């Protein structure tokens, strides 16, 4: 009908969808020019991430979110009070189990999720609550660090009206007690979800059905099947640079003359036996272009001529520089040789 808004169904809380939301949040925070501009967009993105994580956590812990929605908090009656409760961790019964990591989660996400759902503040206190053992020993006995003398426990605090605070504290205690029950190896669904969240935060998450997170992101965004990429075309052999047959006349006809030359006494030329080749190999062709072809003999006019000679005369004296002349060589003339200077 006209005037009615079409309500779209929210995406299902899947790891791929959570990875897309985390990538969008990381992209927005990495752009300094857009930081703080799209306030509503950032708020909606944070709310969607919180909703997806909450639904995934509820599915993991086998708890019904519908029951939590029906049990809404009543209106506050009376003044604001502060309530707290300690839940001791069964470290002695399960000494090898990592309860601290199970309660806090990767980068504290599990504890933050519980705080957002229950409205209580959840903290791990006591011996072994700090990751740095040296720092824990240094702080032991100092003011505000008295809890280090107690056994490992979870401290739950809440501030609200009396009736609301009691309900919040009760829900938080129930949720934390579920985390204090160790699951069998390989059946801990919460641990699997925490490892998956850690992989998403580090950018190393890979879906079991897909090859890479980039492919998972593209398929989840477009909803299309993966396209098959064909292999490269076979490499063709390069074309011949020159034809095997000669393209012109012979450039060295002198070889044929030597092969058929005969001495005046009737004997064959001495070099004819050395030049005997197969009938098809009697001619030699140059494989190069014009600048590299055989050049004719150098003309005598290319050499320098003495100044005393006359060009074209019969008795022209040609000076050929077989050896390099020293540039500082002293020339001794006939008159200087007679005087000794």
Curated annotation (Swiss-Prot):
Keyword Disulfide bond applies: no
SUPFAM superfamilies per the UniProt record, alphabetical: Eukaryotic type KH-domain (KH-domain type I)
Which keywords appear in this protein's UniProt record, sorted alphabetically? Cytoplasm, Developmental protein, Differentiation, mRNA processing, mRNA splicing, mRNA transport, Nucleus, RNA-binding, Translation regulation, Transport
* Placement of sequence motif Nuclear localization signal: 324-330
Coarse class of the protein's main subcellular location? nucleus
Q: What InterPro entries would the database entry show?
A: BBP-like (IPR045071), KH_1_KHDC4/BBP-like (IPR055256), KH_dom (IPR004087), KH_dom_type_1_sf (IPR036612), Quaking_NLS (IPR032367), STAR_dimer (IPR032377)
> Where in or outside the cell?
Nucleus; Cytoplasm
- Per UniProt, residues of the KH domain are 88-154
Transmembrane segments annotated in the record for this chain: none
One cellular component (GO) term of this entry:
nucleus
Which is a GO BP term held by this UniProt record?
A: regulation of astrocyte differentiation
* GO MF annotation list: identical protein binding; mRNA binding; poly(U) RNA binding; single-stranded RNA binding
**Oligomer and partners:** Homodimer; does not require RNA to homodimerize.
**What role does it play?**
RNA reader protein, which recognizes and binds specific RNAs, thereby regulating RNA metabolic processes, such as pre-mRNA splicing, circular RNA (circRNA) formation, mRNA export, mRNA stability and/or translation. Involved in various cellular processes, such as mRNA storage into stress granules, apoptosis, interferon response, glial cell fate and development. Binds to the 5'-NACUAAY-N(1,20)-UAAY-3' RNA core sequence. Acts as a mRNA modification reader that specifically recognizes and binds mRNA transcripts modified by internal N(7)-methylguanine (m7G).
> Which family, according to UniProt?
Belongs to the quaking family.
* Name used for this protein in its record: KH domain-containing RNA-binding protein qki.S
Q: Which organism is it from?
A: Xenopus laevis
């Amino acid at each position: 009908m006209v005037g009615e808004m079409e309500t779209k169904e929210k995406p299902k809380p899947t790891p791929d969808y959570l990875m897309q939301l985390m990538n969008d949040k990381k992209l927005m925070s990495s752009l300094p020019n857009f930081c703080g501009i799209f306030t509503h967009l950032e708020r909606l993105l944070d709310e969607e991430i919180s909703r997806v994580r909450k639904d995934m956590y509820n599915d993991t812990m086998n708890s019904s979110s519908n029951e939590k929605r029906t049990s809404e908090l009543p209106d506050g009656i009376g003044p604001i009070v502060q309530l707290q409760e300690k839940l001791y961790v069964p470290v002695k019964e399960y000494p090898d189990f990592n309860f601290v990591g199970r309660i806090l989660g990767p980068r504290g996400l599990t504890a933050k999720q519980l705080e957002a759902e229950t409205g209580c503040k959840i903290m791990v206190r006591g011996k072994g609550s700090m990751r740095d053992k040296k720092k824990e020993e240094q702080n032991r006995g100092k003011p505000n660090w008295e809890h280090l003398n107690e056994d490992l426990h979870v401290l739950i605090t809440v501030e609200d009206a009396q009736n609301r605070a009691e309900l919040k504290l009760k829900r938080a205690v129930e949720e934390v007690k579920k985390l204090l029950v160790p699951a069998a190896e390989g059946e801990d669904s919460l641990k699997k979800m925490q490892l998956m969240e850690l992989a998403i935060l580090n950018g190393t998450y890979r879906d079991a059905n897909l090859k890479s997170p980039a492919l998972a992101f593209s398929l989840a965004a477009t909803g299309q099947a993966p396209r098959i990429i064909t292999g490269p075309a076979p490499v063709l052999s390069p074309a011949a640079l020159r034809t095997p047959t000669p393209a012109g006349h012979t450039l060295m006809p002198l070889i044929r003359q030597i092969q058929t030359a005969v001495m005046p006494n009737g004997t064959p030329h001495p070099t004819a036996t050395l030049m005997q080749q197969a009938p098809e190999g009697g001619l030699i062709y140059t494989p190069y272009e014009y600048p590299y072809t055989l050049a004719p003999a150098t003309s005598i006019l290319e050499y320098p001529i003495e100044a005393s000679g006359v060009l074209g005369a019969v008795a022209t004296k040609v000076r050929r520089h077989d050896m390099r002349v020293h540039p500082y060589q002293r020339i001794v003339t006939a008159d200087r040789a007679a005087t000794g200077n």
